[in-house]
Regions:
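Extended aliphatic helical segments
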Residues: 47, 65-67, 86-91, 108, ...
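Extracellular ectodomain segments of secreted/surface proteins
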Residues: 108-142
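Long, contiguous interaction/targeting segments characteristic
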Residues: 1-121
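Ser/Thr-rich low-complexity repeats and stalk/linker segments
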Residues: 134-208
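Short, ordered beta-strand-loop transition motifs
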Residues: 57-64, 133-135, 167-168
């Protein structure tokens, strides 16, 4: 086969191996995530941090395992959503180490947006560099389908699938390149949901 005129890394992350965290490990993740939530500088005064978080399937990339999370928090001005991720190093036959976390919040909620078909969050966690100035943002994406019948989620760049995962307990995690540079027009990720018949149910940009 001839050289690819547009060499883009595809399926750069390990697929989920453990699924949604639970039990004591979920508690360990929660301690780390709660601590970083308390450090959000512009979090309104009076917001009560939740005791539990909704975790999403883990993905591994760049020597770390990434676990997204979300939670609702009540404050004096109404309900907020906390979102972010915990990452750690997992060595075979050893306990996880080097826990790190990132968190932010939003007052834009899915239930207030009837037109949404996917409730999405994303965070750039790295950068890929190619030849001749080509580059892209390594992006962790997690979310929930807001339509019935979704069994899988995919990430696409210019109609080409670059990551995919089954939906587990109504949640999914993707990890792929976004915002490609120096390929002519900039190329951005599109997240799609699919049913068991491989029919597209929804398509959303990270920039909607």
């Amino acid at each position: 086969m001839p050289p690819d005129p547009r060499p883009i890394p595809r399926f750069i992350a390990d697929s989920t191996q453990e699924g949604i965290p639970h039990g004591r490990f979920a508690e360990r993740l929660g301690e780390t995530f709660r601590g970083i939530c308390a450090e959000i500088e512009d979090l309104p005064d009076g917001v009560e941090l939740p005791a539990e978080f909704d975790w999403y399937p883990e993905r591994a990339w760049g020597g770390r395992v990434w676990v997204p999370g979300t939670a609702r928090a009540d404050g004096p001005e109404g309900t907020l959503e906390l979102f972010g991720h915990v990452s750690y190093v997992q060595v075979t036959d050893s306990d996880p180490t080097d826990f790190r976390a990132h968190a932010d919040f939003t007052d834009v909620l899915a239930e207030d947006n009837a037109g949404w078909k996917i409730d999405l969050n994303d965070e750039v966690i790295g950068r890929w560099r190619g030849e001749n100035g080509r580059a892209g943002a390594v992006t962790l994406v997690w979310g929930r389908p807001l339509v019935q019948g979704a069994v899988a989620a995919t990430a696409e760049l210019d109609r080409e699938t670059v990551d995919q995962e089954e939906i587990s307990n109504g949640r999914f995690t993707l990890l792929a390149l976004d915002a490609l540079e120096a390929y002519g027009d900039d190329i951005y990720m599109q997240v799609k949901l699919w049913n068991r018949r491989a029919q597209e149910l929804a398509s959303e940009s990270l920039y909607a």
